[in-house]
Amino acid sequence: AYHRAQFRGTVVGITGSNGKTVIKEWIAEELPAGMKYYRSPKSYNSQLGVPLSVLMLEGDEELAIFEAGISKPGEMERLERIIRPDVVVFTSIGDAHQENFLNLEQKCDEKMVLARNASKIVYHSYYEPLGGMVAARFADRKPFDAAAFPEVPESVIGNAASRRNAQIVEAFCAAMHYPAPSFASAPTLPMRLEVKEGINDSILINDAYNLDLNSLALALDYLHGVALNRRRTLVLSDISQSGLSDDELYGRVAGMVARAGVDFLIGIGPRLKRHAGLFGCDKEFYASTDECIARIDRRAVAGRAILLKGARDFRFEKLAHALARRSHTTVLEVDLDAMTHNLNFFRSKLSFGTKLVAMVKAGSY
């Protein structure tokens, strides 16, 4: 809460049963060019994840976006005090964690705590009872109903829930007086920090979904844990929308690369190449991803731990495909409803007030 109190930019809080991460990433993608912003990593929206996210703020961003997730009454009170959002975006309402609430209305009441001090509110009236409750409770603040905004054509975004998410992003941009978003397609959220076997006995860490300083720091830390005794290669693209001058930006990047023990850098893009002198490790640079695929030095691959970290425009998925070891597809189906049932069964056997800690084993997340 203290760290948040020092921040002078605009803070956005996103809550709802589903769609928080998708809408957060979509909003970040549609922000005005050149704006320095921060968004919480992955799905850091819990009682632990939110404080960690706030502590990652550098302090000079214009906009910060956080998710807030709850599983029982009382949790949003704490999250609201930490985030203190100026703008709140409500996504959908559903049955997630319903076992800890008397009814859906109680859950909506809990979620609306996040907006008690917000000056701007965005919601979608399709999602009842949340929509009606938000409209009534915050009528004096004239909340933005996303249902009033044009629906993206089905030919562009086929999924109805994704089209409603797009309307929420439209409403947010209108509330903030940003240019209207230009939707090309629905955003996809592939598994970040995906580890695969690479060619030439390498390990490939694919985190090519987005790129900013915060996510780069997290990815480099992950590389350190995966690499063990292997030498480390970073494949990095130009970074856009940092809000920093190129000299300051790539100076920071060079420091992060050095501290992470990266000994080979492959830079893609003209801005990185112009700042090649900042990097003390072995390095090579390419104008485009396609050129890199065609000319990459095999020394940078064989037996190494390779981190792919690129902005979406650079299409690093093509590079990941080129460097990945070919294998047959294996499908693992996980029944989350069954997992929830099992967790609640064992919770019912515990004494009242006993807390649970869930651990996801190794790199399975």
Label each region the model flagged.
Residues 63, 87, 120, 203, ...:
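Hydrophobic "anchor" residues on beta-strands that sit immediately upstream
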Residues 304, 315-365:
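A charged N-terminal "starter" segment
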Residues 78, 155-260, 340-357, 363:
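Nucleotide phosphate-binding/pyrophosphate-handling subdomain across enzymes
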Residues 17-19, 69, 126, 209, ...:
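Active-site beta-loop-alpha junctions enriched in small/polar residues
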Residues 1-120, 129-135, 299, 321-327, ...:
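Phosphate-binding loop of NTP-binding sites
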Residues 86-203, 229-230, 255-264, 270-283:
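Acidic, Mg2+-coordinating active-site environments of NTP-dependent enzymes
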Residues 1, 170, 214-222, 229, ...:
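Extended, hydrophobic interaction surfaces within ordered domains
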Residues 14, 50, 67, 79, ...:
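Residue-level signal for inorganic ion chemistry
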